[in-house]
């Protein structure tokens, strides 16, 4: 039985090793986290979780410098629901609260920017990217990002809006 997502909800696309970056004042108090970005038929979900990927697997999700619309192998809706329950830093954004999905270039790097309204009807913005290098001490944080083409994800998100 699922607790966080509906029984008729299913994963449309998911990407591993994604870093989220919050904007505004909340971004000042929010450390970037690595996790899984999942799009279901009802929600956009980010779950902080470290996954180890081999280079062949990396090509499946980020080959040709494109964020591909695929599903994680061996990652089901039950796993997603369990990860949401385990990590309090997870967030769920209903697709009807999405305002915009766009690609933003900052310092020669393309980020996926999601704008949505939270429960208090305030606009929130998050950027998503994958990293080239990460510093692990004192806390795991990204240093440099890959510049990806997010067109497929943007089109998919806009089709769900």
Regions found by a protein language model. Name each.
Residues 2-31:
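The phosphoinositide-binding surface of pleckstrin homology
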Residues 32-34, 45-161:
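Acidic, Ser/Thr- and proline-rich intrinsically disordered linker/docking segments
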Residues 35-39:
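Broad, structure-driven detector of short, well-ordered beta-strand segments within folded domains
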């Amino acid at each position: 039985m699922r607790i966080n997502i509906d029984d008729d909800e299913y994963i449309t696309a998911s990407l591993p090793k994604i870093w989220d970056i919050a904007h505004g004042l909340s971004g000042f108090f929010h450390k970037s986290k690595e996790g899984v970005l999942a799009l279901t038929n009802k929600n956009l979900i980010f779950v902080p979780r470290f996954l180890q990927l081999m280079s062949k697997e990396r090509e499946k999700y980020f080959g040709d410098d494109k964020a591909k619309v695929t599903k994680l192998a061996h990652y089901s809706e039950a796993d997603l629901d369990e990860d949401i329950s385990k990590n309090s830093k997870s967030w769920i954004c209903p697709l009807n609260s999405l305002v915009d999905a766009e690609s933003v270039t900052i310092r020669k790097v393309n980020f996926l920017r999601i704008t949505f309204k939270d429960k208090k009807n305030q606009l929130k913005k998050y950027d998503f990217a994958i990293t080239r290098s990460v510093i692990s001490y004192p806390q795991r944080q990204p240093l440099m990002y890959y510049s990806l083409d997010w067109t497929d994800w943007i089109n998919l998100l806009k089709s769900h809006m």
